[in-house]
């Protein structure tokens, strides 16, 4: 058969389609300007598990950049404003084919609840022959507790574009998978 996987990719391609443009903010119905909903930068945190809905553990981070570079784990965002698309090539580890992708737009640093920056995430490692987990990674349940920068009354005013997050799941099966991610604003103005 024909292999449709790009030659530069280490793993299988995952195509990401971003929708929502932040308008589906669940905390308010406040409208937002185009500059508030724009995606200027994007980090994709990849978690893997043995089964769908299982114990997802951190695998790697992909960051938006000027060029696609699989070795550096960077990707180029195509499109403009809120209509963005991207492709990543996550590392495949035997035994953990189920992936959960957490996308964070317009915020490059994550914090613990007390305001301190998070410690570096620990990547899961599996035995290449058996697929058994040899090194446990940071759990997705812990990752979901992290925060973006806290706004202080005396601090810098809220800037645009606004922080948005979204997530999606897929399984490494064929050469290409498409994941639709709905980004939601995490802050709004009143």
Regions from the PLM with identified roles:
Residues 1-190:
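Sec-type signal peptide cleavage vicinity
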